[in-house]
């Protein structure tokens, strides 16, 4: 190219580029070329640059291409790699982007010079109408064909009392209800297409684009066709791939196009709206059904927790009101009863004898949770969990109808082969469905990986149990230290009634256990992902199911093992004075206090549950906030106006494919705390309720402000988590029955009340004395007797054994067997009663409500009728056209024949 006078070659190229991008109104200010002198040419170049700069500044926060018309549906980012494989990555990108263009997608690249860090390229992707309609048909996306004549569900009676909780109708139902049908290009006239630009929601658009990206090839390497954006992301060919948020979350859109992100932030992600219902339809429209159904489940679970929390709070208040009048605590606190009972030492040698009334306050606290209401609450929660799951099935069925998921088929991305599986496969096999050859891995090749996986899982479980044993050893070893220290320190005597050695050990052990749990969680997440990867699952769905099972098993053992120990093992295999059981022949087994072990289980459960919730909420809220602040601080060097929309989203945290996985896992673990051991802690549902109320808003705030927009995906249920919840519901019936029988003191009190009490006016009078056996101090072995000699002849301990003057001294007496029989009877009766109710309720409550069945039938009927009428009218039009053409041809032939006769 010959250089123009006064301009360099670069300036000429730049001028041509700008002329192509400027509009007619903008170029009207330019001096005509035939009148240009060198200074005027430079003025034109300056003006072009200034106009383009202003346009660039104006469009930096835009979600459109430079033309301001084509919407950005997806963004890819990358940096040039100067290493030896940089050329290979560049070639992959060229091939990939070329193939994307062949599918019909529009691409526009932002040069690295326009980015904040000066090294990142951004590829903006737009799906034109033809691409959208083609893949909408491929994916079977349902779109509206007619306004529905089925009325929306009405609020129940007395709903006006919940006016403050309800959202405005325009927010709750942002769009009308329609009859829908699977989209078809050949029936476009059937669908309610008012504007092609807004017909497909942004969530549907990014879902279609991601489907294309996940199946687009980028070359052939080592004789294998390489496919999909995920493989390119794994190899760092691209840094990221994400759909754009609608706009800024703190201000509405300046255009007529609604800013759904702002609407969500305003009506959902505000912490001041914690008492409001959630805008589920807005969530679904913006994030897709998969994320939407998670928030529906979390909201429903929180609503149901309200009933459990109220009943649990009532049981706690009952325990609080009856605490002072409790006969057992009264006898323990009485100086003439509990003050005269000398208890055997709680550890060997260093521990001294002690009086029963020193545990007065401890016994009162124990009564808060160990009272008659415990049995009622255990039965109630067994029925509550059944109602929760059965009504969730109905809620899920209603959701399937409202969100057009009735004929849902699993997402293609979930059923697509994983790149890692394809890379490891050397064999191929005919797919009986698609009739195509697919990569196949024989079972004999999988067995070694399954063995490695099974071994690792077993080792992980053993490590978890060993950590629990280590904490148990800590509790055993530190108990004697606490006991001797509190006994010897005169300054601690005043607090000894409040802070007993048992309580000190329980608190310190629970706090240590909570810390260990949180640390092990971090490692087991990595281990579970590594093990699952080693198994080489075939599809993404198989990968998620396998990972879910492993993570749940690890978390189950990690969080609940210590609670199972306190509930079912502590104090059950202690022995008796003179014949105690020892762990590793060193540490004496832990004993329960005179009021039982239930208060220790409550302490353990409270610390772990609340500690986990506090840590989880702080981590969820502050981690993305700090990370995003740091990334923005490093990246942004110009004013906010020049910080482009795609760069703003690029600097947000990645939600990832497993984002929902961790949310479900956290909810299921919390569900376990609220059901498995709820008989020991009736306030657990209340704490879970408070956590969820704020947790919903934290999750909403994260998704709308701190994370990149996730790719929309469909789901019609919560998947494998529903089976896990059903399993935990069944286990919870057994655990609560065992807690009431073996951990609480209710059954022994009832046995004494009905079978052994001799006081008709106060049947529980004398229960404390009856529950403590007598031991002759002279029978202590030398290595266990306290160093400090006392004048006592006997001491008491918690068990049902014969006294030292009996011929079967220290053997279990008949009352022990009566109590044991009563405990087993209670377990059998409670389990059968609860399971009977469970099966009866499951039978009475249909999985799909009757009105939903009728609505589904109505919609199917109307859809078939509308399509039938459309096809019939189309056929008539075609027949009319064909008939007209035939008649026209007949008339022409007749006219020609008449002309021929006239000529003859």
Swiss-Prot record:
Residues 312-371, 475-502, 570-667, 745-825 are extracellular. Pfam families: Anoct_dimer, Anoctamin. The gene is Ano5. It is found in: Endoplasmic reticulum membrane; Cell membrane. It is a multi-pass membrane protein. Its main location: endoplasmic reticulum. Highly expressed in skeletal muscle, bone tissues and thyroid gland. Plays a role in plasma membrane repair in a process involving annexins. Does not exhibit calcium-activated chloride channel (CaCC) activity. It comes from Mus musculus (Mouse). Belongs to the anoctamin family. Residues 1-290, 393-453, 524-548, 689-723, 847-904 are cytoplasmic. Induction: Up-regulated during the course of myogenic differentiation. Down-regulated during osteoblastic differentiation. Keywords: Cell membrane, Endoplasmic reticulum, Glycoprotein, Membrane, Transmembrane, Transmembrane helix. GO terms for molecular function: intracellularly calcium-gated chloride channel activity; protein dimerization activity. The chain crosses the membrane at residues 291-311, 372-392, 454-474, 503-523, 549-569, 668-688, 724-744, 826-846. GO terms for biological process: plasma membrane repair. The term 'anoctamin' was coined because these channels are anion selective and have eight (OCT) transmembrane segments. There is some dissatisfaction in the field with the Ano nomenclature because it is not certain that all the members of this family are anion channels or have the 8-transmembrane topology. InterPro entries: Anoct_dimer (IPR032394), Anoctamin (IPR007632), Anoctamin_TM (IPR049452). This is Anoctamin-5. GO terms for cellular component: endoplasmic reticulum membrane; plasma membrane; vesicle. Glycans are attached at residues 326, 357, 371, 759, 769, 782.
């Amino acid at each position: 190219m010959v250089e123009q006078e006064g301009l360099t070659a670069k300036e000429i190229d730049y001028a041509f580029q700008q002329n192509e991008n400027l509009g007619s109104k903008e170029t009207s200010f330019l001096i005509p070329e035939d009148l240009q002198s060198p200074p005027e040419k430079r003025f034109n170049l300056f003006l072009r640059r200034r106009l383009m700069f202003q346009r660039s500044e104006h469009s930096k926060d835009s979600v459109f291409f430079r033309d301001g018309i084509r919407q950005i549906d997806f963004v890819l980012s990358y940096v040039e790699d100067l290493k030896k494989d940089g050329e290979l990555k560049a070639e992959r990108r060229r091939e990939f982007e070329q193939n994307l263009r062949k599918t019909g997608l529009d691409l526009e690249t932002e040069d690295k010079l326009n980015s904040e860090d000066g090294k990142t390229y951004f590829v903006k992707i737009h799906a034109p109408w033809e691409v959208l309609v083609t893949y909408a048909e491929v994916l079977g996306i349902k779109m509206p064909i007619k306004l529905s004549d089925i009325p929306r569900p009405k609020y129940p009676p007395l709903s006006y009392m919940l006016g403050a909780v309800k959202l405005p109708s325009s927010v709750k139902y942002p769009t009308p209800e329609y009859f829908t049908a699977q989209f078809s290009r050949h029936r476009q006239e059937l669908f309610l297409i008012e504007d092609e630009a807004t017909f497909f929601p942004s969530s549907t658009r990014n879902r279609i684009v991601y489907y294309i990206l996940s199946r687009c090839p980028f070359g052939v390497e080592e004789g294998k066709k390489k496919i999909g954006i995920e493989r390119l992301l794994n190899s760092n060919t691209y840094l990221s791939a994400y759909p754009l948020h609608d706009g800024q979350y703190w201000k509405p859109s300046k255009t007529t196009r609604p800013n759904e992100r702002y609407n969500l932030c305003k009506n959902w992600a505000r912490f001041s709206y914690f008492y409001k219902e959630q805008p589920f339809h807005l969530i679904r429209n913006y994030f897709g059904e998969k994320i939407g159904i998670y928030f529906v489940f979390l909201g429903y679970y929180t609503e149901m927790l309200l009933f459990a929390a109220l009943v649990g709070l009532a049981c706690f208040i009952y325990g609080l009101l009856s605490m002072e009048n409790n006969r057992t605590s009264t006898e323990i606190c009485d100086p003439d009863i509990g003050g005269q009972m000398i208890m055997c030492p709680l550890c060997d040698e260093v521990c001294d004898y002690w009086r029963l009334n020193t545990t007065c306050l401890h016994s009162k606290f124990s009564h808060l949770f160990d009272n008659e209401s415990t049995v009622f609450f255990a039965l109630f929660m067994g029925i509550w969990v059944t109602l929760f799951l059965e009504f969730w099935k109905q809620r899920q069925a209603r959701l399937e109808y409202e969100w057009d998921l009735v004929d849902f088929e699993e997402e293609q991305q979930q059923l697509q082969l994983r790149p890692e599986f394809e890379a490891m496969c050397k064999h191929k096999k005919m797919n009986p469905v698609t009739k195509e050859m697919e990569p196949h891995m024989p079972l004999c090749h999988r067995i070694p990986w399954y063995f490695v996986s099974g071994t690792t899982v077993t080792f992980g479980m053993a490590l978890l149990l060993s950590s629990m044993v280590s904490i148990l050893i800590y509790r055993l070893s530190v108990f004697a230290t606490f006991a001797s220290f509190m006994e010897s320190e005169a300054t601690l005597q005043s607090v000894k009634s409040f802070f007993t050695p048992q309580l000190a050990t329980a608190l310190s052990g629970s706090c240590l256990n909570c810390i260990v749990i949180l640390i092990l969680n971090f490692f087991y997440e990595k281990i579970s992902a590594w093990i699952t990867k080693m198994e080489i699952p075939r599809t993404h769905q198989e990968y998620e199911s396998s990972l879910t099972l492993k993570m749940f098993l690890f978390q189950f053992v990690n969080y609940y093992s210590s609670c199972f120990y306190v509930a079912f093992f502590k104090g059950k295999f202690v022995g008796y004075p003179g014949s105690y059981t020892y762990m590793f022949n060193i540490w004496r087994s832990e004993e329960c206090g005179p009021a039982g072990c239930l208060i220790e289980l409550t302490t353990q459960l409270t610390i772990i549950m609340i500690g986990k919730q506090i840590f989880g909420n702080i981590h969820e809220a502050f981690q993305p906030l700090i990370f995003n602040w740091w990334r923005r601080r490093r990246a942004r060097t110009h004013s906010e106006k020049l910080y482009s929309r795609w760069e703003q989203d690029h600097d947000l945290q990645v939600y990832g494919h497993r984002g929902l996985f961790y949310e479900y896992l956290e909810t299921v673990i919390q569900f376990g705390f609220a059901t498995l051991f709820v008989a020991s802690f009736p306030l657990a549902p209340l704490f879970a309720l408070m956590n969820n109320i704020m947790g919903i808003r934290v999750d909403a705030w994260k998704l709308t402000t701190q994370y990149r927009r996730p790719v929309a995906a469909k789901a019609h249920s919560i998947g494998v988590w529903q089976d896990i919840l059903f399993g935990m519901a069944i286990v919870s019936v057994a655990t609560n029955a065992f807690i009431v029988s073996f951990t609480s003191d209710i059954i022994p009190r009832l046995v004494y009340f009905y079978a052994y009490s001799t006081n008709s006016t106060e049947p529980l009078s004398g229960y404390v004395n009856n529950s403590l056996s007598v031991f002759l101090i002279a029978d202590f072995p030398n290595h266990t007797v306290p160093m400090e000699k006392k004048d006592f002849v006997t001491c008491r301990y918690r068990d049902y054994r014969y006294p030292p003057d009996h011929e079967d001294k220290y053997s279990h007496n008949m009352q022990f067997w009566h109590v044991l029989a009563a405990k087993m009877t209670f377990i059998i009766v409670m389990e059968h009663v609860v399971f009977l109710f469970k099966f009866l309720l499951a039978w009475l409550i249909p999985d799909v409500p009757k009105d939903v069945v009728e609505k589904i039938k109505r919609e199917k009927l109307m859809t078939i009728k509308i399509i039938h009428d459309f096809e019939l009218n189309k056929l008539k039009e075609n027949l009319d056209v064909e008939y007209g053409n035939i008649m026209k041809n007949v008339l022409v032939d007749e006219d020609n024949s008449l002309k021929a006769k006239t000529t003859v």
